Amino acid sequence: MQETVAYKRYLAVYDRTVEFSSPTTTPANAEEKISIKYDIVGHPRSGFRFVAVLPFHSETREFTVCREYIQSVNASGVTVPTGGHEPEKHGEDIANAAKAEMNEEAKLVGGRLVNLMEKKSENEGDREVGEEEGFIETKWCRNKFVPFLCVDPKDVEEGQEGKLDVEEFALETFRVDLKELKRMMYSGEMMLPSIITCQMSLDYLVKSGLISKDEYHGSS
């Protein structure tokens, strides 16, 4: 495999060439190879890792979500607090990135943070030291994301709010009930990493008894 950087700004585009055995290999041409070029996209500044975190407020039975500008379709869309894991800013623990994004985008701190990927990987023993678990964002993207749930965070104190990135100028934060969250998840307006984070969070909340099965199914 060979790879070079074709373009780099906020994201990087990699020109990757991969060599495969020919699909028409026979004993007579066993050494025949084919080379295929791919465009690969990723965010090297964050080590190709990001987080998505869904805040749940048990007293009001609500969830905090965001509405922000989605540049690819030039329209607004719904997300949960989401952002890159930058080791120089957050340290090696990816949970710190989830806490920071929740502070910056939702103005929430504290609560019980749950890494929804822990013990999910069947290949955990195959990982190299420092390699993070996570879902691959898309087949042509190097980024992986780790979903988190935060139960009962509190409003951040005045003056302690994290600073939004300049491109997040239009971000709005609001709360929704379970019925509205599920509607947004399957309406086409929510980003896929956020949908996965919401579904895994709801599964966790039901299994842990924080949301009853009747409450979950009654919201459909």
Predicted regions and their residues:
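Acidic pyrophosphate-coordinating catalytic loop
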Residues: Q2-R9, S21, H43-S46, S121-K144
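Acidic, metal-coordinating catalytic segment for phosphate/diphosphate chemistry
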Residues: E3-L54, E59
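Conserved hydrophobic/aromatic beta-strand scaffold that supports enzyme active sites
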Residues: V13-D15, L54, V65, P147-L149, ...
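Short loop segments at secondary-structure junctions
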Residues: S21-P23, H57-T60, Y69, V151-D155, ...
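Conserved Nudix-box catalytic region and its N-terminal flanking loop in Nudix hydrolases
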Residues: V41-L54, E59-A100, E104, L108, ...
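Conserved active-site beta-strand-loop modules that form the wall/rim of enzyme catalytic pockets
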Residues: E62-F63, G111-L113, K144-C150
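Nudix hydrolase/Nudix homology domain
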Residues: V73-S76, P81-G83, E124-G134, C141, ...
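Short conserved catalytic/interaction loops centered on acidic-Pro-aromatic/His motifs
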Residues: L108-E118, E137-C141, E157-E161
